[in-house]
Amino acid sequence: MALLVDRVRGHWRIAAGLLFNLLVSICIVFLNKWIYVYHGFPNMSLTLVHFVVTWLGLYICQKLDIFAPKSLPPSRLLLLALSFCGFVVFTNLSLQNNTIGTYQLAKAMTTPVIIAIQTFCYQKTFSTRIQLTLIPITLGVILNSYYDVKFNFLGMVFAALGVLVTSLYQVWVGAKQHELQVNSMQLLYYQAPMSSAMLLVAVPFFEPVFGEGGIFGPWSVSALLMVLLSGVIAFMVNLSIYWIIGNTSPVTYNMFGHFKFCITLFGGYVLFKDPLSINQALGILCTLFGILAYTHFKLSEQEGSRSKLAQRP
């Protein structure tokens, strides 16, 4: 009986963790979009706030023994910290200049780009069926972008740069974790302050600092509270991702990501009244089919690899 109670509690904890991640992941997209649309807060400055709050949050976490920091040489993290800046800044610029549907769908292109990088730069091979799933993903993104009545060329440039830098960042994070033998929180603990320092230097060259529209400009209390809330939620997203992967698996997190993908798209059309044509809807379904097929084939191949290892004498 006690064992059954423990199992039920465990399932409830995981369900609560997944629900929390769902809420904060969707909330951060809509909140950032709201800040851009209704307050006009500068992009790089918002990213800087996110990085600083994330580092402060991680500092509190390590003081509470949630994780143990590991000493890392800063010189080996410079490129990673720079790509971290790039991926968050360009992703936020994509959100600022595109509809939520186009922003969310463009992010799906990260999978094909990661596969291309690993194939050409790291000589990693992928099965034919995995490669074929890239066709519906890419076709769906093209369909949605082509028929988007709010199509924005600058927004698509930012989306493309965001996908490229995000893909590089994700590949490098995996490589650095393996190379330095650290987990994601230990890596982020060093990365966040380095990225904050880089943005602190860059912000004055691209955005006003003290004048109208600057980070220290005459903002309303509501705008400042929303920016601070955005930073706290961004940290919660990172923390909940780490908790979910640690208590379930990366596969569970990715499968749950498909549900968040659909909810975020739907919320964008409801909250911000983004128009949706039939062809765009077909593009979304096409991309979603490709993502689900990719996940299914990837799972099958991982299970096959485990079975072969288990059968070895």
Curated annotation (Swiss-Prot):
Family matches, as Pfam families: TPT
Sequence intervals crossing the membrane: 17-37, 40-60, 77-97, 126-143, 153-173, 187-206, 225-245, 252-272, 275-295
Compartments in which it is found: Membrane
Keywords attached to this entry: Membrane, Transmembrane, Transmembrane helix
Record's GO cellular component terms: Golgi apparatus; membrane
Domain of life, source organism: Eukaryota
GO biological process: transmembrane transport
UniProt GO MF annotations: antiporter activity; nucleotide-sugar transmembrane transporter activity
Membrane topology qualifier: Multi-pass membrane protein
PANTHER family in alphabetical order: SOLUTE CARRIER FAMILY 35 (PTHR11132)
Family: Belongs to the TPT transporter family. SLC35E subfamily.
Entry function: Putative transporter.
Protein's UniProt name: Solute carrier family 35 member E3
Lineage: Eukaryota, Metazoa, Chordata, Craniata, Vertebrata
Gene symbol of the encoding locus: SLC35E3
